[in-house]
């Protein structure tokens, strides 16, 4: 847990160091940061045959749980644009990040694997 916290704090410093224009493809070295706070973002997953594996944690979920995300960062904070049935936004201070929980209601764990329900 201490190592994970240290890594996240390290990424927080990296995140604060520069701006990031609106993108669907954040830099690979920033994925641990962006994928921690909105876990269902499409850029966090490798999908094959309807099952998706998280690029950071190797957790598996159904492709139905994946949402399209656009992220950006500026001097005011870190921002996610999340596309589900109705577009959603998640804004946070980059140095005080907080998880987005809006999609958790669509996820279900089954046998140690998270299976997504249709959105």
UniProtKB/Swiss-Prot annotation:
<keyword id="KW-0244">Early protein</keyword>
<protein>
    <recommendedName>
        <fullName>Protein MGF 110-11L</fullName>
    </recommendedName>
</protein>
<comment type="similarity">
    <text>Belongs to the asfivirus MGF 110 family.</text>
</comment>
<dbReference type="InterPro" id="IPR004848">
    <property type="entry name" value="ASFV_fam_110"/>
</dbReference>
<dbReference type="Pfam" id="PF01639">
    <property type="entry name" value="v110"/>
</dbReference>
<feature type="signal peptide">
    <location>
        <begin position="1"/>
        <end position="17"/>
    </location>
</feature>
<keyword id="KW-0732">Signal</keyword>
